[in-house]
Amino acid sequence: KVVSDAGLDLHTVYPELSADKKLGEVLLTPTRIYVKQVLEVIKNCDVHGVAHITGGGFDENIPRILKEGQGFSVTEGSWEILPVFQCLEKWGNIPHREMFNIFNMGIGMVIAMPAADAEKAIAILAKHGNKAQIIGKVIEGENEII
């Protein structure tokens, strides 16, 4: 919808998105598969929940791993939001907060665990070539994502 409404061409290179890839190529970039790495994290850390951030973004996927009375506070700026999401927000005139409800904003997986295990999990994922970081924390609040 954003592509058609904004009059964009899938066969055009948009410099703010990519220096050399056409819009269509960027939008068709395949999803990473994390199964082996996540299983290793589960084996070595005290994992409380795993959420694959798909359609519905943060707001629909993270609550699935929260217990009753819990919410999640996202630390915006703790990871780099990819140019594709920045461009979609601008081109589609989508409110910034709504972007997190529609897209994964570059976060494919959220793994909930005690803070004490986070660095170990990050190291395991880095060993497999995945960039991981702490993006927030569990808070009190009924399925609230802030």
Regions found by a protein language model. Give the residues of each.
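Glycine-/charge-enriched secondary-structure boundary and capping motifs
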Residues: 9-146
